């Protein structure tokens, strides 16, 4: 099964292809950071405009890097929040257009929960990885460490820094979160 992930919750545009729920085949990111620097932070309007300009190229690069064709994608996953409204709309609209035009199911996902799930993906890494490094990171051959449920998950992501109790991957309880917005 091939899943296309699209992420546009803030100032970056990203697309990735994951095989069988865990193996990352590609991950392409386009950042608009240089356009925001002179303002001292992310400007939502600039972020969404840059995403409109780059999202097609990011998708094409992710599909090509994964070595698959768009028609081989079985599911499209897209960030639906939290995030900047304009940026989220770019990603969701783009994902829905692909979903409808090619008849591929669409799954909207919570950006913060995705940080928890990302811990269990098998990352791309060079063929020559020292054994000690593999063991330190919890990798065994082609598999990343699986979760032992339940567990506590910590996500440190700006104004959305949170501590979660993960009963299973469909039951996540927020134990605490930051009160600031940055």
Model-predicted regions and their roles:
Residues 1-182:
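Short acidic/glycine-rich loops and adjacent helix/strand connectors
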């Amino acid at each position: 099964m091939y899943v296309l992930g699209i992420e546009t919750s803030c100032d970056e545009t990203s697309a990735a292809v994951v095989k069988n729920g865990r193996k990352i085949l590609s991950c392409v990111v386009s950042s608009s950071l240089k356009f925001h620097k002179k303002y001292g932070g992310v400007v939502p309007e600039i972020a969404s405009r840059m995403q409109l300009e780059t999202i097609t190229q990011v998708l094409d690069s992710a599909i090509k890097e994964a070595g698959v064709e768009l028609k081989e994608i079985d599911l499209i996953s897209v960030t639906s929040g939290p995030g900047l409204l304009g940026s989220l709309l770019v990603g969701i609209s783009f994902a829905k257009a692909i979903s409808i035009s090619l008849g591929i199911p669409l799954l909207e996902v919570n950006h913060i929960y995705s940080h928890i799930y990302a811990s269990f993906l098998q990352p791309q890494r060079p063929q020559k990885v020292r054994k000690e490094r593999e063991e330190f990171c919890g990798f065994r051959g082609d598999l990343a460490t699986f979760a032992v449920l339940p567990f506590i998950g910590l996500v440190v992501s700006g104004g959305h820094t949170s501590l979660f109790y993960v009963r299973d991957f469909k039951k996540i309880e927020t134990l605490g979160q930051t009160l600031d917005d940055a």
